[in-house]
């Protein structure tokens, strides 16, 4: 059964006022069955901004279409694959696609959050991916990493050096690959960030600089340090 559900909203001060943007959280969920066995579970959260700037409409449409595309992937890819696996005798069910939203900072003009997708199609581990997004909610503009740091000209170099130093001086550098300085340089992507009240958090994909057991590596860069 498929259903779309409005779950919650976040709004500064808890109310909606002129010039203020609220973030609504919607859910698409559908479970897929074959011969009485639940073979796929699809659970997708996506954001919608309620505000006055027309650019927010384009963002909302983008987030909605991304959610529908993921749901279609459950229907057209995961479900046929799961049915085939079931018919071949596999007992590893259900396959799963779970997409969550975590709001990390909201001010009168900035909303920062990340979406995290977990995809399981059998095997020892599922695949987890994370996408960061920071929006100027007054204009609809998607903000960039260096917009929030002091050293805008050399901010990426400063951040990479900061991350390498954090790993080197951490309690257990062994949770990262031995050649982490080279890997930080090679796999750093400036779009992989979100904001908190303390600073910018930069993250790396699984396996980029550390084994799967480490999880998604994250590094807090205080606003005053770069």
Where are these regions (language model features)?
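Compositionally biased intrinsically disordered regions enriched in Thr/Gly
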Residues: 7, 11-226
């Amino acid at each position: 059964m498929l259903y779309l559900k409005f779950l919650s909203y976040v709004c500064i001060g808890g109310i909606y006022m002129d010039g203020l943007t609220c973030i609504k959280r919607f859910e698409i969920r559908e479970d897929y069955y074959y011969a009485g066995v639940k073979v796929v579970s699809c659970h997708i959260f996506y954001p919608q901004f309620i505000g006055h700037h027309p650019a927010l409409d384009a963002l909302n449409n983008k987030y909605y279409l991304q959610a529908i595309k993921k749901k279609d992937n459950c229907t057209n890819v995961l479900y046929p694959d799961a049915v085939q696996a079931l018919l071949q005798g596999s007992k590893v069910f259900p396959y799963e696609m779970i997409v969550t939203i975590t709001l990390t900072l909201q001010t009168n003009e900035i909303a920062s959050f990340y979406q995290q997708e977990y995809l399981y199609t059998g095997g020892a581990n599922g695949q987890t991916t994370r996408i960061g997004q920071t929006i100027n909610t007054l204009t609809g503009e998607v903000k960039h990493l260096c917009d929030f740091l002091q050293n805008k000209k050399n901010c990426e170099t400063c951040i990479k050096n900061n991350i390498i130093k954090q790993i080197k001086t951490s309690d257990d550098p062994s949770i990262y690959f031995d050649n982490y300085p080279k890997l930080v340089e090679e796999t750093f992507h400036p779009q992989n960030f979100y904001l908190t009240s303390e600073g910018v958090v930069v993250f790396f994909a699984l396996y980029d600089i550390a084994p799967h057991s480490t999880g998604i590596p994250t590094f807090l860069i205080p606003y005053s340090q770069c």
